A protein has these predicted regions:
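C-terminal helical cap
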Residues: 154-180, 226-241
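Short acidic/histidine-rich active-site segments
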Residues: 108-110, 185-209
Length: 254
C-alpha cells in the first residue's frame, strides 16, 4: 500500500508537491512534516493487517517516519538513487540505509525521467523553456510534470517529444548503476526492479516487459550471479512478503 503519490494528502507529505492552478504555484514543500497523526495510525493498522507499506513518492521525512514506526519490512516499489540522479522522488542515502536495516527492498525504476541529472543547468533551462512554450509552469519536480494539463493534443505531443529528446535515451547501464549503488550500501538482498511503463521507459533495450532479458544480460556482465539475479527479479520481494505475513501472525499472537 502506497501512502501518497503526487501531492500531499491527509496521511502524508509527498516528494512531489502538486501544482495548484488556483494559486499558480506548487503547494508547500511539506504539510505535515512527514506523516500526519492519521498517517502514523495507518502505518500501525497496515502492519496489523499484514499489508506491505510502499514508501515510493513519500517525502524524505515521511519515509523515515514510516521506517521508524513499522514493525515489518517496507518496500520502495519504484524509486532510484538521489546521489546519482537528484530528482525529488529518488531516495537519499539515509533512506536507503534505513530500508536495508528494516529488511526491506528498493525497486529501481527504469524510467528516464527518474534517471537524468537534474543538476545539469543547461538541461534544466532547456526543459523550462519547453514547458513555457507548452503553456505550463516552468517549475517542475520531474520533466514531464503537468503534460496532462496541456489541452491541445498536438501541443502536448510536441512537448513530450521535446522533453524526451532533451533527456536523450537512457541505457540499461544507467539502470544497473542504481542497482550497483544500492547493493554497495545495503547488499543484494535489498534491491529489485520496479517498472513504471505507463509512459514508456525511455530506456534503450528495456522499453517494455518483453525486453527484460536484456537487463539480466546486463546484470551478468556486471558480475551478478544467478542467485543474485533471482533475488533482484522478485526473490527479495517474496522474502519481504513472507516476512510481513510472519510479523502479522506474531502481532496477533501477542
Amino acid at each position: 500500500l502506497a501512502l501518497t503519490q503526487m501531492g500531499h494528502n491527509d496521511i502524508a507529505d509527498s516528494s512531489r508537491p502538486v501544482f495548484d492552478g488556483a494559486t499558480g504555484q506548487h503547494e508547500a514543500v511539506a504539510e505535515h512534516g512527514g506523516l500526519s497523526a492519521l498517517g502514523k495510525n495507518a502505518v500501525r493498522s497496515i502492519n496489523a493487517l499484514g499489508g506491505i507499506i510502499d514508501i515510493s513518492q513519500l517525502s524524505k521525512a515521511a519515509a523515515l517516519q514510516v521506517l521508524a514506526l513499522s514493525d515489518a519490512p517496507v518496500i520502495a516499489s519504484h524509486s532510484n538513487v538521489w546521489q546519482l540522479s537528484n530528482v525529488s522522488r529518488n531516495l537519499s542515502d539515509e533512506e536507503i540505509d534505513r530500508i536495508g536495516e528494516s529488511g526491506g527492498v528498493i525497486h529501481v525504476a527504469p524510467f528516464r525521467g527518474y534517471l537524468f541529472d537534474s543538476s545539469d543547468e543547461t538541461l534544466d533551462q532547456a526543459i523550462r523553456a519547453a514547458r513555457q512554450v507548452a503553456g505550463i509552469t516552468e517549475d517542475f519536480y520531474y520533466p514531464f510534470e503537468l503534460y496532462w494539463e496541456i489541452e491541445d493534443e498536438a501541443v502536448q505531443q510536441k512537448f513530450l517529444r521535446t522533453v524526451s529528446d532533451l533527456l536523450g535515451p537512457g541505457s540499461i547501464g544507467d539502470v544497473i548503476d542504481h542497482i550497483d549503488y544500492i547493493v554497495s550500501r545495503i547488499g543484494v538482498d535489498h534491491v529489485g526492479i520496479g517498472t513504471d511503463f505507463n509512459h514508456g521507459s525511455g530506456i534503450t533495450g528495456f522499453n517494455d516487459a518483453s525486453e527484460a532479458l536484456n537487463v539480466t544480460i546486463g546484470l551478468l556482465a556486471r558480475g551478478y550471479s544467478a542467485e543474485d539475479i533471482h533475488k533482484i527479479w522478485g526473490g527479495n520481494f517474496l522474502r519481504v512478503f513472507r516476512a510481513v505475513a510472519v510479523s502479522k501472525d506474531k502481532a496477533i499472537k501477542e
